[in-house]
C-alpha cells in the first residue's frame, strides 16, 4: 500500500503569519513522516514560491519558512495557483526550480484521488 497523500493549500502570506506558518509546518512534517505531500500556494502565499520572499518571513517561535519550503520541495511537490500567479505578474521563470504553476482542475484532481486528505490554511 502506498503512503497516504496529503494536499495542503496555503491561502495567506505574512498578513496572517501564524496560519501561513502552520500550513508550511504541517506540510514539512508530513513529508518528513513519509506522506506524499503537495503544497499549493495560493493568494498571497504565491509569493513564497519566488526567490527571497520566504527568507523575509518572520514569526516568533516558528521554524524558518524558507527551510520548511525547501524541505517540502525536497520530499514532495509545491504548486502555485495559475490565476494567483497571473494576478501578481509571476511567471514560471520567476519561481524557484521545482515549483510549478498549475490550475484548479489539477488541484481538484489531486484532492479527489483515493486515499488523499486535503487541508486548507
Where are these regions (language model features)?
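Residues at the starts of beta-strands that form the adenosine-phosphate
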Residues: 5, 36-38, 77
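Short, glycine-rich nucleotide/cofactor-binding loops
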Residues: 7-21, 52-53
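Short, conserved beta-strand edge motifs with alternating hydrophobic and charged residues
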Residues: 8-9, 38-42
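Histidine-anchored nucleotide/phosphate-binding helix
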Residues: 20-35, 39
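N-terminal beta-loop-helix "entrance" segment that forms/cooperates
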Residues: 45-59
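A glycine-rich helix N-cap at a beta->alpha junction
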Residues: 55-85
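A short aromatic-anchored loop/beta-hairpin motif
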Residues: 79, 88, 92-95, 101-109
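Aromatic- and Gly/Pro-rich donor/ligand-binding loops
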Residues: 119-121
Amino acid at each position: 500500500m502506498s503512503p497516504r497523500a496529503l494536499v495542503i493549500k496555503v491561502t495567506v502570506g505574512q498578513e496572517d503569519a501564524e496560519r501561513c506558518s502552520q500550513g508550511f509546518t504541517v506540510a514539512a512534517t508530513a513529508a518528513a513522516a513519509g506522506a506524499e505531500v503537495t503544497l499549493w500556494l495560493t493568494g498571497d502565499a504565491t509569493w513564497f514560491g519566488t526567490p527571497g520572499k520566504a527568507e523575509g518571513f518572520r514569526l516568533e517561535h516558528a521554524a524558518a519558512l524558507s527551510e520548511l519550503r525547501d524541505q517540502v520541495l525536497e520530499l514532495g511537490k509545491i504548486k502555485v495557483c495559475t490565476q494567483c500567479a497571473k494576478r501578481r505578474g509571476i511567471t514560471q521563470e520567476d519561481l524557484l526550480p521545482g515549483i510549478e504553476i498549475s490550475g484548479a482542475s489539477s488541484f481538484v484532481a489531486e484532492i479527489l484521488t483515493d486515499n488523499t486528505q486535503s487541508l486548507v490554511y
